[in-house]
């Protein structure tokens, strides 16, 4: 991969080793609800699956996120993006994530694991005060039920495990018998969800 798309050539060997070690540690002992994907040819391109936290509008979803390390990482923070579409105050239309940990609160000793856990926490406690999606931020503050319904609908449409590739909790057997065993059941559940979504969409259109 050329340096036009990657900063791997600009990172020190020590930084590359440190990042790779942390990723391998996370693969061996994954944080709850997070599955990291290792790209051994380019450690500056880090992707992970994050399970939507229980008790939130994102609970049924699995979200793919991407971290892009800057050329002087860890002195400057990486950029973080949701690759899965999501309705959230702190996520821009291009997927960019706004969180203080990756801005003013960044410290060079914060690792990849801390960043991914922070993103997961953002799904639990959004920050409408620093909204990149103003509509979502305003809706969260003024009409939470509508916000929750919209976020849940987007999650059910875009963040299903089959669309994202795999769930974080499926780290051990993405292609094993467990996946095949649940495929039929997942299809039935998704068909039911589609019916429910169509009804919800019709209701929302009537209210517009």
Curated annotation (Swiss-Prot):
Presence of the UniProt keyword Magnesium in the record: no
Stretches for region Disordered: 161-193
SMART domains, alphabetized: UBCc
Coiled coil region boundaries: none
Swiss-Prot/TrEMBL catalytic activity: S-ubiquitinyl-[E1 ubiquitin-activating enzyme]-L-cysteine + [E2 ubiquitin-conjugating enzyme]-L-cysteine = [E1 ubiquitin-activating enzyme]-L-cysteine + S-ubiquitinyl-[E2 ubiquitin-conjugating enzyme]-L-cysteine
An individual GO BP term: exit from mitosis
InterPro entries per UniProt: Ub_conjugating_enzyme (IPR050113), UBQ-conjugat_E2_core (IPR000608), UBQ-conjugating_AS (IPR023313), UBQ-conjugating_enzyme/RWD (IPR016135)
Nucleotide-binding listed as a keyword: yes
UniProt GO MF annotations: ATP binding; ubiquitin conjugating enzyme activity
Pfam families associated with the record: UQ_con
Broad enzyme group: transferase
Keywords: ATP-binding, Cell cycle, Cell division, Nucleotide-binding, Transferase, Ubl conjugation pathway
EC code: 2.3.2.23
Pathways per UniProt: Protein modification; protein ubiquitination
Catalytic residue positions: 98
Function field: Catalyzes the covalent attachment of ubiquitin to other proteins. Acts as an essential factor of the anaphase promoting complex/cyclosome (APC/C), a cell cycle-regulated ubiquitin ligase that controls progression through mitosis. Acts by specifically elongating polyubiquitin chains initiated by the E2 enzyme vih/UbcH10 on APC/C substrates, enhancing the degradation of APC/C substrates by the proteasome and promoting mitotic exit.
Name listed for the protein in its UniProt record: Ubiquitin-conjugating enzyme E2 S
Source organism of this protein record: Drosophila virilis (Fruit fly)
């Amino acid at each position: 991969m050329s340096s036009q798309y990657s900063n791997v050539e600009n990172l020190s060997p020590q930084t590359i080793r440190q990042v790779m070690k942390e990723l391998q540690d996370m693969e061996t002992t994954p944080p709850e609800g997070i599955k990291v994907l290792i790209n051994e040819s380019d450690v500056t391109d880090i992707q992970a699956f994050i399970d939507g936290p229980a008790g939130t509008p994102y609970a049924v979803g699995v979200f793919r996120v991407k971290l892009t390390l800057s050329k002087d990482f860890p002195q400057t923070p990486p950029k973080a993006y949701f690759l899965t579409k999501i309705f959230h105050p702190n996520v821009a239309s291009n997927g960019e994530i706004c969180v203080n940990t990756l801005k003013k609160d960044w410290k060079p000793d914060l690792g990849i694991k801390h960043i991914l856990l922070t993103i997961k926490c953002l799904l639990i406690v959004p920050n409408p005060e620093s909204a990149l999606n103003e509509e979502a931020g305003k809706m969260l503050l003024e009409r939470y039920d509508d916000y929750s319904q919209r976020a849940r609908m987007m999650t059910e449409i875009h963040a299903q495990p089959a669309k994202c590739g795999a769930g974080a909790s499926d780290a051990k057997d993405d292609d094993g018998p467990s996946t095949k065993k649940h495929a039929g059941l997942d299809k039935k559940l998704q068909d039911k969800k589609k019916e429910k979504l169509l009804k919800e969409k019709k209701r929302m259109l009537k209210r517009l």
